[in-house]
Amino acid sequence: MKTIYSISKHEVSDEQIEKDRLFKVFVLGLPRSGTSLMTSICQTLGVNMIHTTENKKDEYDKRYKEKFGEYHPNESGFFEIGENFLEHYLEIIDKPYSGCKMIIPVVGLRLDIIKLIPSKVIMMWRDPKEIKESQEAFYSNDSDESYLRTALATQKVNLEKSGVDFMVCHYEKLVNDSYREIYSVSDFILSDKGHKEAVALVDPEKHRFRKEEIPV
């Protein structure tokens, strides 16, 4: 029987929690599907997450805050290709209750790597039309909605076939019903803290980024 840490408030010893958490957390999704937001949520819930924008955050603040508000572009400019995944993967191996994020277009055979260790994957799912609009606004290029739809469906099937423990988090629900969605994530990753703080991270006005709403 699964122990629900956050909702039922079962008393669980620190030793038992540590034993149960012998897994790594991976946030998986397409660019502009909510992976950065979910990474921050997992961090707030207590997971030692690696953020891809940490090293250049000050630089991004200076260059882009005026145009994009609080949004921070990733380490590759506006399009994250995820070239540092292996480095991040190796870094979290020996770090307790840790994780990092992956971007679907460059995930390749990484599910096979993830299967080598106990893992929990949170797959972000967003309407491909919204992803297309957001990508076109931020990356200044054309995006193929049919490709995005196929990429999402294919990755979900791959996860189902892999046997990896995963959940799908819908971006729309995360933004519009953040309390319920974050508690589901919290239970999935066996978090016992930071729930209210994680919910407070979600701002429906900020986490939308439809093409016509981007300031120019």
Locations of the language-model features?
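PAPS-dependent sulfotransferase catalytic domain
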Residues: 99-195
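PAPS-dependent sulfotransferase catalytic core
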Residues: 1-94, 201-216
